[in-house]
């Protein structure tokens, strides 16, 4: 069953055949690495951990929050498909929003723990 986004993409880019252009077995796409890169440029102590997280996430095929918790037991699962990751021993926090069907991750927030305490992680 296709949804409105799939139909609009197929209308713009017609294809023939029976394959699904939204392959749920393909690796996740992380949008946007530049946000992480800009952050680790200012906070070089977390560069390696953010690069590792990015590489792991970009190679993953997570289908649900339980799969993320298996790999990241300290991650916090929030409503609306948001996940909070502790970075560098909880000195930094990374919030993502994930669409499991389309295998896409959006970076919603990266900041210090003090900055994280000032935001609403469920709404950012």
Can you say where each PLM-predicted feature lies in the sequence?
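Basic, Lys/Arg-enriched alpha-helical interface segments
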Residues: 2-91, 99-104, 113-124
């Amino acid at each position: 069953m296709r949804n409105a986004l799939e139909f609009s993409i197929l209308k713009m880019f017609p294809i023939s055949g029976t394959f699904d252009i939204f392959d749920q077995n393909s690796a996740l796409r992380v949008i946007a690495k530049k946000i992480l890169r800009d952050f680790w440029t200012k906070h070089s102590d977390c560069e390696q951990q953010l690069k590792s997280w990015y590489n792991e996430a970009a190679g993953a095929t997570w289908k649900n929050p339980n799969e993320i918790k298996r790999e990241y037991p300290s991650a916090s699962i929030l409503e609306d498909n948001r996940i909070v990751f502790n970075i560098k021993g909880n000195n930094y926090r990374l919030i993502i929003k994930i669409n499991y069907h389309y295998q896409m991750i959006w970076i919603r927030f990266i900041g210090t723990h003090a900055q994280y305490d000032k935001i609403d992680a469920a709404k950012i």
